[in-house]
From Swiss-Prot:
GO terms for molecular function: hedgehog receptor activity. It comes from Rattus norvegicus. PANTHER family: B9 DOMAIN-CONTAINING, B9 DOMAIN-CONTAINING PROTEIN 1. Keywords: Cell projection, Cilium biogenesis/degradation, Cytoplasm, Cytoskeleton. Belongs to the B9D family. It is found in: Cytoplasm, Cytoskeleton, Cilium basal body. Residues 9-127 form the C2 B9-type domain. GO terms for cellular component: centrosome; ciliary basal body; ciliary transition zone; cytoplasm; membrane; MKS complex. Transmembrane segments: none annotated. GO terms for biological process: camera-type eye development; cilium assembly; embryonic digit morphogenesis; in utero embryonic development; neuroepithelial cell differentiation; regulation of protein localization; smoothened signaling pathway; vasculature development. Part of the tectonic-like complex (also named B9 complex). Pfam families: B9-C2. This is B9 domain-containing protein 1.
Amino acid sequence: MAAASPSVFLLMVNGQVESAQFPEYDDLYCKYCFVYGQDWAPTAGLEEGISQIASKSQDVRQALVWNFPIDVTFKSTNPYGWPQIVLSVYGPDVFGNDVVRGYGAVHVPFSPGRHKRTIPMFVPESTSTLQKFTSWFMGRRPEYTDPKVVAQGEGREVTRVRSQGFVTLLFNVVTKDMKKLGYDTGPVDTQGVLSPSLPQGNPQ
């Protein structure tokens, strides 16, 4: 008797929020969460997390190193709404209040294998000089009530933002049953081994 064809595919993601570059700031920590479409559902692992506080390295890079692990598995019936990871970085201001130092988002890589991504971060800005001074004095900087809005397009065009810092992520991606459902994610099979019959590109 033939085995039934799969009705869903799996996307397994692990890796780490590796490090960050914020030249103007120190003693920062990072929160992450995943945003995905309505046809997706997590089946294992953690959808969100918060790292330890990291201080800048003493070498010339002055990197903030978290090496904070990511491990989650999703199932879906179609690729629409492919998961994105949203990052929020926080740290103290001159008054000791935790304020946002950067938001950023990136899609989980589509092809299986090992991937490295550097995400440019940004912060919302007050629209006037008076608002900037008031928010600085009160210790309440502009921030999103829900960081997941970073991964969505609605309303982003009317938000004033300023670029600030970078965060580096490492992903190890494995997919299962995507080809059986008719989706081709590239020359890497479900075990993460390059297929010898296809040309091998440079690793991302």
